[in-house]
Amino acid sequence: MSTVHPAQRVAVLVDAQNLYHTAQSVYSRNIDYDELLDAGVAGRELTRAIAYVIRADSPEEESFFEALENIGYETKIKDIKTHADGSKTADWDVGMILDAVTLAPHLDTVVLCTGDGDFSRLCSHLRHEGVRVEAMAFEESTSEELLDAVDGFTDLSERAERFLL
């Protein structure tokens, strides 16, 4: 696949829930989304930065969403759905996949900030279309399928002091 160069058009797509849960469960810390974006872009031409977030009705959410926008992310917000049996779900996988496929003709690289193996098939498709695919996540919670499917991987655990607050 293509190498990294400054003229590459890049989109950074962040699965905020996926990263948040690992940062909290393993490190009891939060993600530094400014550093995440800077590392994802890596000196290339940023086309889009999208953070996919879940609204869970906690008081600090709105300020978090606003902070993401101030950094430069477009935020896509989904409410938690409560089902008849009382279970709750909130998932952005399909939305992220649709955005990546829609943006792909206008990009050279897609950076997926997630460790979710559900995106491995997307990676294969994007690579087939000539788009470089990179992932950024905590390796200890990243699926092998995703690691095998991407052109490049940044392990946030290796530089936790940079990527965690």
What are these regions (language model features)?
Residues 1-92, 132:
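Domain-level signal for Mg2+-assisted phosphodiester chemistry and nucleotide/NA-binding surfaces
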